[in-house]
């Protein structure tokens, strides 16, 4: 059993010491503690996009380019985690080098495949692992989720409407947006859909056909995407 408190934030050094294993990567196996530590890093502009829905996590497998292999490295470890004796844990990163520890996770359904874009922009098959978070913990700070979404929007802000539409279409098997418990419910939204909707609107509210009520600091009209 890993001696960390679910919901608490730990520095990279403390996390690495607790698991006594790899100190980088999204799926970190430790033979010493017989654990697999899954990292959902929201600070990186990576092709991985994990979906959180209440106490369930739809975790994207390992492999940034090409089709992912269910029998490759730690994908196999996670796929067999209900029978191989390896304990699975999960942490999230909202700020570099700091990990919000979520505690134990359990594979609750068979992994399935989705088509997504890899880091080179090529369509490929990825494996999605349906997980259940076992340990109780405090709800996520809603402001952290909002900041994460804003950062992803800024990273994709230079894409054209056609490029954004291609990213949206690539997620053919994607689930509905996840809903995360905060002090009020927070729906996990896709930044590409938000940006595409804003480009299409051209500063005009599609509900009332009026210009945006005010301008943001960068001079762009403020519109809320629903």
State where each predicted segment sits.
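Acidic, glycine-rich low-complexity segments with interspersed aromatic residues
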Residues: 1-100
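A residue-level signal for beta-strand positions that form part of recognition/binding surfaces
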Residues: 35, 128, 222
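Generic secondary-structure microfeatures
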Residues: 42, 92-94, 109, 201, ...
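Conserved beta-strand residues within beta-sheet cores
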Residues: 87, 102-104, 194
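Compact mixed alphabeta submodule
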Residues: 94-153
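Short, charged surface segments at domain edges that flank catalytic/cofactor-binding sites
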Residues: 156-220
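Accessory, usually C-terminal, subdomains that scaffold auxiliary metal cofactors
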Residues: 220-226
